[in-house]
Amino acid sequence: MPVLLTRDLGVTLADGERRFTLRVPELALEPGEAAGLTGASGTGKTMLLELLGLLRRPEAGGRLLVGTGAEARDLVPLWSARGGRSRLAAARGRLFGFVPQSGGLMPFLTVAQNVALGQRISGSEDAARAAALIARLGLGPVAGLRPDRLSIGQRQRVSIARALAHGPRIVIADEPTAALDPEAAAEAMALLIGTAAATGAAVLVSSHDHDLLDRFALTRHRLVPEARDGHVVSTLRTGAEAAA
């Protein structure tokens, strides 16, 4: 049973006579599933992650259901509901974890404080869970250091721990290994997927590294653009369509 399900989700951006439309006919993520998002530069991968993560407003008419069974809720109507923005922010902080390309760590906080930050924001502080993630990701020896004392690979591991510390249902990772060498990229991907699976969170990873996605057997989704008289429409293809 999916923890995230979309139906006809989309958004259009206009710049003079030029328009770009992102279309997501359907996307389903199961609890514990690891999925990869691919597509050429400019096809809207980051925009899609923003839509799913409640960071960008979709067009009316689409659906974005988060949760399983009877607890599943369509979050699209909150964009236009009274008080909806605060409810969206609360849902985003509670249901989603984010791993950005750069790590996105607070430079004035230690590793342990950065990991606990998501818990504080979502109101779900759990020191034991944060400590367990720090240990699992091999960050114990550097837990008291600030990000400027860490390697790039260590910073990404901190970002992974922070994204999972509050127990999100879905983790969204935007090119999380782009700044890493192949060995460090494989290590970070293994830690992200393995740790998320252990917590039951679904993971969607945007990446240009097809070989890395194949190595970890991620379910593949692909954005395919089509130009129509100055209007580019980028559509998400899933399953067999994504492999075509």
Question: What is the predicted function of each stretch?
Answer:
Residues 167:
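Conserved catalytic motifs of ABC-family nucleotide-binding domains
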Residues 71-97:
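ABC ATPase NBD coupling module
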Residues 160:
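Hydrophobic anchor residue at the start of the ABC signature
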Residues 109-116:
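Short coil-to-helix segment of the ABC ATPase nucleotide-binding domain corresponding to the Q-loop/switch region
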Residues 171-174:
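Catalytic Walker B motif of ABC-type/P-loop ATPase nucleotide-binding domains
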Residues 146-150, 154-156:
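Conserved ABC ATPase signature
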Residues 127-142:
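Conserved ABC ATPase "signature" region
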